[in-house]
């Protein structure tokens, strides 16, 4: 009797509705008794933990991990995105002028739809339309920050207190600045100013003290480490959203056409400031460990339907700027 599953048996849950995102370190991933499991060592014991692949969107493998060919085959059949990255949200490879933040292996067991790829490519070579896409992404980003920073969930965090009018003024200023942008570099300048101001606002909201955002995973304080870690989880969701729609990671609209995987960073930015940033500072002041913070982020992603936001934003931009005649 053939007990093998077909890919269609495993893809019954839409990616945007899948509940699980995994970040694993110091373990082995294998197939045991027909199930994909990760194995951890505690003393002389090997502990086996099930990964429900049909309800998992992305698995990120950090330092000290190995994965068998059989496990990779099952991940592909279930449509699970795999990302190899450094430990605790640091780049996988870094050198003088080259950095690989995450190396992605997308499921290859089925063809992806071409509708959104055709729409995306039809405008992507036009500088003005690519700029319009970048600004549209930033508008979504602003909406997400307003919604979640001023929402009921964050207002219940007694450690995170700030004046809403300060945030509103900051976002209004950024929104106005976007209307004057003529190039993607103009957008990047405005974005950098806005992000720096958000860091300052968040640090003050929890009485964190002096804070400087470290680059390339070089931060040693808790807030920087948690920001890196949470951002990598956002990259995982972003990679899934682009794969679901059949969009190559190289077709960025803001992070540069030559940066590897730039579209993943563009899409992750839609929710990073809204969801990861405040949680990183709250968790740092609570003295949480990485696992507790990771659960904070995943809960926030699920409750806010972050993957839905990413997929919907990509679809909206693709359809509105498309030059394809149908």
Swiss-Prot record:
* Alphabetical list of Gene3D superfamilies matching this protein: CRISPR-associated endonuclease Cas1, C-terminal domain, CRISPR-associated endonuclease Cas1, N-terminal domain
Query: Keyword ATP-binding on this protein?
Result: no
Question: What are the recorded GO MF terms, alphabetically?
Answer: DNA binding; DNA endonuclease activity; metal ion binding
The protein's UniProt keywords, in alphabetical order, are: Antiviral defense, DNA-binding, Endonuclease, Hydrolase, Magnesium, Manganese, Metal-binding, Nuclease
List, in alphabetical order, the GO biological process terms annotated in this UniProt record: defense response to virus; maintenance of CRISPR repeat elements
Q: How is it used?
A: If the spacer DNA has a perfect match in the chromosome then toxicity results. Suppression of the toxic effects occurs via mutations in the CRISPR/Cas machinery, or via target deletion, which might contribute to genome plasticity. This CRISPR/Cas system can be used to remove genomic islands, and possibly other genomic regions.
Enzyme class, broadest EC rank = hydrolase
Q: What induces it?
A: Expressed in late exponential phase (other phases not tested); part of a large cas-CRISPR3 polycistronic operon.
* Chain positions recorded as Mn(2+) binding sites: 191, 255, 269
Signal peptide residues on this chain, from the entry's feature table: none
Q: Which cofactor does it need?
A: Mg(2+); Mn(2+)
List the EC numbers from the record. 3.1.-.-
Subunit description:
Homodimer. Interacts with Cas3, in the absence of crRNA.
The family classification in the record reads: Belongs to the CRISPR-associated endonuclease Cas1 family.
Q: Briefly state the protein's biological role.
A: CRISPR (clustered regularly interspaced short palindromic repeat), is an adaptive immune system that provides protection against mobile genetic elements (viruses, transposable elements and conjugative plasmids). CRISPR clusters contain sequences complementary to antecedent mobile elements and target invading nucleic acids. CRISPR clusters are transcribed and processed into CRISPR RNA (crRNA). Acts as a dsDNA endonuclease. Involved in the integration of spacer DNA into the CRISPR cassette.
The record's section on NCBIfam families has: cas1, cas1_YPEST
* Name of the molecule in the record: CRISPR-associated endonuclease Cas1
**What is the source species?**
Pectobacterium atrosepticum (strain SCRI 1043 / ATCC BAA-672)
């Amino acid at each position: 009797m053939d007990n093998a599953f077909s890919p269609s048996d495993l893809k019954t849950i839409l990616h945007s509705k899948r509940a699980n995102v995994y970040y694993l370190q110091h373990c082995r991933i294998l197939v045991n008794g027909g199930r994909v499991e990760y194995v951890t060592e505690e003393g002389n014991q090997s502990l086996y933990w099930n990964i429900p692949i049909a309800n998992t969107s992305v698995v990120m493998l950090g330092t000290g991990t190995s994965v068998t060919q059989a496990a990779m085959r099952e991940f592909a059949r279930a449509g699970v995105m795999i990302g190899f990255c450094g430990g605790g949200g640091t780049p996988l490879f870094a050198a003088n002028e080259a950095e690989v933040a995450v190396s992605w292996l997308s499921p290859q067991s089925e063809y992806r739809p071409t509708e959104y790829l055709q729409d995306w490519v039809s405008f992507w070579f036009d500088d003005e339309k690519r700029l319009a896409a970048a600004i549209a992404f930033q508008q979504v980003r602003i909406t997400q920050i307003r919604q979640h920073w001023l929402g009921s969930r964050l207002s219940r965090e007694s450690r995170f207190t700030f004046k809403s009018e300060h945030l509103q003024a900051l976002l209004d200023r950024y929104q106005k600045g976007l209307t004057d942008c003529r190039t993607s570099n103009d957008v990047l300048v405005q974005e950098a100013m806005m992000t720096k101001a958000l860091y300052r606002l968040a640090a003050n909201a929890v009485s964190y003290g002096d804070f400087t955002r470290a680059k390339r995973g070089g931060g040693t304080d808790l807030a920087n480490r948690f920001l890196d870690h949470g951002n990598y989880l956002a990259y995982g969701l972003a990679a899934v959203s682009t794969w679901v729609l059949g969009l190559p990671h190289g077709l960025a609209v803001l992070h540069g056409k030559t940066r590897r995987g730039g579209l993943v960073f563009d899409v992750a930015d839609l929710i990073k400031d809204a969801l990861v940033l405040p949680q990183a500072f709250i968790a740092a002041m609570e003295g949480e460990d990485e696992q507790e913070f990771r659960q904070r982020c995943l809960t926030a992603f699920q409750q806010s339907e972050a993957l839905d936001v990413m997929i919907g934003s990509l679809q909206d931009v693709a359809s509105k700027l498309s030059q394809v005649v149908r």
